[in-house]
Amino acid sequence: MKMTFRHYGPGDPVTLEQISQIPVIRSVVSAVYDVPAGGVWSRESIRAVKDAAAAHHLGFEVVESVPVPEEIKLGAPGANVLIDHYCENLRRLGEAGVKCVCYNFMPVFDWLRSEMEHQAPDGSNSLAYDEKTVLSMNPLVGELSLPGWDESYTKEQLRGLLHQYESVDEEKLWGNLRTFLEAVIPVAHEAGVNMAIHPDDPPWGIFGLPRIITNEKNLKRFLKLVDMPENGLTFCTGSLGADPDNDLVAMAEEFAPRIHFAHVRNILRTGERQFHEVAHPTECGSLDIYGIVKALHKGGFDGYMRPDHGRMIWGERGRYGYGLYDRALGAMYLSGLWEAIVKSECGK
């Protein structure tokens, strides 16, 4: 297992120097953030990310993410050209030494939350989701003031995009995903890059949009679309764990050989389709983080891991979910679990 830490480039309030001071971190997860979805990343821009990390003795082996344009998800005209661009990005990333690319196939919204600063009794704050609040902000009937909307879309553009998806049900989305994978996975194989799809967050349909990377059954179906080792998963415990029907411990062990990237975080479920994010340790939330990490090890996981969304603590301000302090605590906690599990297993 290789512990990593996400960094959002030069504009990130968390600096590479700070990340390099977290004892267990040897590599950053980053991307080229100034090229729109569907564009081709220049070799120079990829090299700049790698060189910036190397200046602080950090590697750059995981990209999160190379966004999949909506035209590909829709199966719209021009999708083939954009798939070609995606393949070229994989070739260039492989040339630069990148080993894993995290991406998602969520229509329109990468993720949704109803509150960005949910206050805890101890004074910390975190991201929260309440289905009733989210549905009250339906873009087809109301104002778009909900945290998490993609600000690159105007209200009119967003409504238009949602209208296009009215003809895309789950099976059509599965078909478009297959088309994408059949093109990119062989290229990823040649480039030495593992592809790791991120689950839908949250793992259920929103505003009539289909969501398909949601549970054990669908993860099995996904892996069979193109049954090659490079076609793998990002195992995000917080995303999948929002649905109490998902047995994360069992899934972690089952899918471990095809999990190339693990996002490990805890959430506290407070009602039906209602949760907020908490500190990483098991005792803080609804997820058995120890059990999940142990299951990953038992299943043979040998990929990249990172602490996921953290709380804002100790007065820190910055990018929601991506402050320094709580994620650093999470990295140390997860690394401690892993070390203890490895050494206890070796001692048997």
Features from the language model and the residues they span:
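Histidine-acidic metal/acid-base catalytic patches
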Residues: 1-18, 51-54, 71-75, 83-84, ...
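Acidic, His- and aromatic-enriched active-site or binding-groove loops in soluble protein domains
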Residues: 88, 120-144, 215-228, 327-331
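N-terminal ordered "arm"
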Residues: 13-16, 22-35
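Glycine-rich, positively charged N-terminal anion/phosphate-binding segment
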Residues: 22, 40-61
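Glycine-rich, proline-tolerant flexible connector loops at the mouths of alpha/beta enzymes
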Residues: 31-47, 207
